[in-house]
Amino acid sequence: MFRYYKILLILSLVMISSCDSMKSISSKYNILYNGDLFLNEGIDQLRNSYKDNFWDIIPVIVDNNITNSLPEYPTKNFLKSEEKAIKVIQKMGDYRNSASNYINDAYLLLGKSRFYDKRYISSLQAFNYILKQDVKSNIWLEAFYWRTLIYINLQQYELAKSSLEKELEDNKISKRNLSLLYDSMSELHYKKGDYPALIKSLKKAVKHSSSQEQIRRSYFIIAQSFMNLNKNDSASVYFQKSIDTKANNFSDIYLDANLKLSLLKKQELDEDYFNRMLRQPRNLMASSKINYYYALNSYEKGNYNDSEIQLKRSLKKIDDDKNLKVKVYNKLFEVNFDRKDYLSASNYLDS
């Protein structure tokens, strides 16, 4: 009888201990969840304020280029998510097995919080905790991805390249993770301004990507890179690929791909092409840019009067695009200079 009660007592203690452990893990999961909320709120603020500069070649990875998009940086969000991650790490540091995933999640949250707050060295320390482990799990590869971006941002290009090349030799990496690695390699070539290598890398990234939005972006950057290399026939092919991608046709990239293509196919397009674009409600906020490309098309065909009309229409509608305003004034100068109206041309020279 005594033995029976002894067994019951031991089982009860084990159950109580297990319940306490599960409650602790559950509590830390809630902390991580709240930390992710703070992190994502800060990231969303940055993404919503970020705008691609289509007058230059756009970056491959948006999230690696959004940290300067707000004058009032959302540091508070990232500090709060960092605090949540540290709290989990401190309270679960002695747990093993069932808790290890939570520890890794906490270090990943810690690294990302510091990354978006532009504290790259301390972010690197957090990711290295995960990367020192032997098992190449999905979270390991995600930490590797973020570490690579840190190397790129610190201009440690050779270190980023060598580590990526070594990792890409692993034929067991999933398609999704291969896409991340090739995007990282492409971002590296973008930052270095190595456009032939960027084209080559992005073509590989597209083969492994499941995101139609990222595929459209990759095709667009390939086309921009070909234009930069004066390979306009190839650029036309990839602008068309970007347009044909089954992604959101209300995106800025979709519009700009059509406009860039109009430059390369100027003899094939007439005023109806641009008027149709101007009539579409989705292009209402971009009418100044459409008028500008309309003007370029007319100018290339020698229709200087039509070009001037469209340039002046563009000028009336420009909001905060300083690059566009400069281009419009420069083109107005050219139009009047070519017509030998030097007095009118001089009015735009210093505008």
Predicted regions, residues:
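Acidic, polar-rich low-complexity tracts and alpha-helical solenoid repeat scaffolds
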Residues: F2, C19-S351
